[in-house]
């Protein structure tokens, strides 16, 4: 979070005080949230605003209105707008990844974990806000640091899938597939299905993309000595 440096000049200190006053100012006399609660609310509001208006058109005031906060409070969390997309995506993915891991830790078998992976990876419905955020971010130009963040986020999901398959192979529940190639095929299929779901392809009106993906993965992972 941006804070004034000790050697900041009078102008910077004045700006910092103004920002601090904006953060502390009540909005419609309602209590301003603080800490993790405030950051979570700001992030969720940003996801919705970006999905609705697009990355290029969204304003900090749009996010503030959705979050029920002052614009100064939003600026406190994001600083400049050019940091917005990657910060929000990183937060969204960390939140989704943590919820997946909690569910996976409670699952009894690798097969259950595989089903959870598919459910958490695919968008829930056409226009899913979290997946829309992915597409908005990918459409933007990025420097090397930004591309590394996106690579790390993608790699994290591949590593989750690898962990499930490794566990299933160790217990004899999954076939001994060549892991790098399997992950590439699995992720490519899931990404293609995600596009279908987001677009609202009619083929999925009476069928489940989740069930289709899971059946395909289970078929490839089924040990050869099982029917």
Q: What do these predicted regions represent?
A:
Residues 52-56, 107, 171:
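Short coil/turn segments at alpha/beta junctions that flank glycine-rich nucleotide-binding fingerprints
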Residues 1-37, 225-227:
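N-terminal intrinsically disordered/low-complexity leader segments
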Residues 87, 100-131, 182-186, 210, ...:
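Hydrophobic alpha-helical connector segments
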Residues 147-151, 155, 169-217, 224-227:
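Hydrophobic/aromatic-rich alpha-helical bundle segments in the mid-to-C-terminal region
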Residues 41, 45-52, 99-106, 133, ...:
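Solvent-exposed, amphipathic alpha-helical segments
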Residues 90-96:
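Short, basic, alpha-helical segments at the C-terminal edge of helix-turn-helix-like DNA-binding modules
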Residues 38-41, 45, 49-83, 87:
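Helix-turn-helix
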Residues 119-162:
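Short secondary-structure transition hinges
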